[in-house]
């Protein structure tokens, strides 16, 4: 009776099983070790066993990818041909759609998906990094406050901008090649009169006068 409920299929191999393993990765352990000889830049020829290698050949399209959401549920049918990772890596998990939409997650802290801070998606303000942003708090970009490097302010930082943990501000040097133009009083008064006439005309149109 036990042989009927739990049959031993290894005793009856089929001739087409090697073809299924080669083309569709059939009956291969998904947790099998990664082949150390395989180089995705060269291809299957880099491995002595080629396409018949019992170990996993990680292709180039799988490098630095996110985890397959279908694989997490056991529903992925692509096996090794899937363009997403088939491994549990918290840093490469897909983004939680519920958290991205609502700002909180009902499954937290047990949620398997990645919770990304919405502010991290906002690009930094170039004007603020230069030293001053005219929009202030109304700026749609992110103002990142950093501690100024005193060595850089004094004249030289041996670590440089990339290695130093503190801020190296950009100093904006105005273009002095073009001559400065000073407006005359007549131009200023003419502009004021035009603005006053425009306000008076709008008041007449709106029936305020």
Swiss-Prot record:
It is found in: Nucleus. InterPro entries: CPSF4/Yth1, Znf_CCCH, Znf_CCCH_sf. It comes from the Eukaryota. Disulfide bonds: none annotated. The keyword Repressor does not apply. GO terms for cellular component: cytosol; mRNA cleavage and polyadenylation specificity factor complex. A zinc finger (C3H1-type) spans 29-60, 62-89, 90-118, 119-146, 148-171. GO terms for biological process: mRNA processing. Coiled coil: none annotated. GO terms for molecular function: RNA binding; zinc ion binding. The keyword Zinc applies. Keywords: Metal-binding, mRNA processing, Nucleus, Repeat, RNA-binding, Zinc, Zinc-finger. Component of the cleavage factor I (CF I) involved in pre-mRNA 3'-end processing. Belongs to the CPSF4/YTH1 family. This is mRNA 3'-end-processing protein YTH1.
